[in-house]
Amino acid sequence: MSNSWWEITILCHPHLEESITWRLDKFGCSGTSREIKGKSYIIQAYAPQIQYQSLDISALSLWLQQDALVLNLPQPLTRWKLIDEEDWASSWKEHWEPTEVGDRFIIYPAWLTPPEQTDKLILRLDPGVAFGTGTHPTTQLCLESLEMRLSKSPENVVIADIGSGSGILSIGAILLGAKKAYAVDIDPLAVKAARENRHLNQIHPDHLVINQGSLTELLELVSDGVDGIVCNILAEVIIELIPQFSKLARPNTWGILSGILLEQSQAIADTLEQEGWIVAALWKRKQWCCFQIRKAPEN
């Protein structure tokens, strides 16, 4: 079959839902859905065959089992099969509904018609194969943190979004009134999805610059630093990036970091302190957390 997708079905303990959803998102799956079966959950997700072989899905299954061991919960049962693209599109999109996030956002799937009148900021999204649909706790924590940060005088604020996925965070920043945002992701499919979502939200490319790459490429785009850094990726990657954040920083630069499990928070906090950053707040949701940080004053 051309344009085939892996349909991944996982039978799991309900307390594993968030960690499995996070793992699937980071792996590169799209359209995660959930249904209840007795005392268990059935989680389904989809991954493009062009990117993943059966061995890759087997490795994912092992990661899910290891995550369950860490959480001291029963191991999930994972099955997968190939389906064609038409089946994939209809299978997951029917499960995704508009989602309110924080006080100001409502995330609207691209294939649904948004309301003509609402007091919410409508963020339209078609994530494609990229991470970021607005349903995961880490994405919601980041959007809520941006809402707080940009509640006053956002018109001069410049944002850097590292590991931007679908572009949901940088798009959210622009909708909240930020002057400009730079978004980078190492995945070309994520870059493509983010650019399509930029167009979907009628944002000019000069206001939201989206490029393939990581912090190195971002530094080439930004010559005089940014006011805010947002980063919702794996904790291990964040730890590697923190020593370079100062290259992006202005004296009053702040940051929003998530994709971090609670048990990983101490390692993040220690690295931030070593590199001259202060943890201003730590928001928690289920087993996830979101750091709000600011640059420590120079002695």
Swiss-Prot record:
GO cellular component: cytoplasm
Keywords assigned: Cytoplasm, Methyltransferase, S-adenosyl-L-methionine, Transferase
Binding residues for S-adenosyl-L-methionine: T139, G163, D185, N232
GO process terms (BP): methylation
Catalyses which reaction(s): L-lysyl-[protein] + 3 S-adenosyl-L-methionine = N(6),N(6),N(6)-trimethyl-L-lysyl-[protein] + 3 S-adenosyl-L-homocysteine + 3 H(+)
A Gene Ontology molecular function term of the record: protein-lysine N-methyltransferase activity
Keyword Hydrolase: no
Keyword Cytoplasm included in the entry's annotation: yes
Location (main, coarse): cytoplasm
E.C. number(s) listed in UniProt: 2.1.1.-
Pfam families: PrmA
Subcellular location field: Cytoplasm
CDD domains per UniProt: AdoMet_MTases
Protein family according to the UniProt entry: Belongs to the methyltransferase superfamily. PrmA family.
HAMAP family named in the record: Methyltr_PrmA
Function of the molecule: Methylates ribosomal protein L11.
Name recorded for this polypeptide: Ribosomal protein L11 methyltransferase
Organism name: Crocosphaera subtropica (strain ATCC 51142 / BH68)
Gene that specifies this protein: prmA
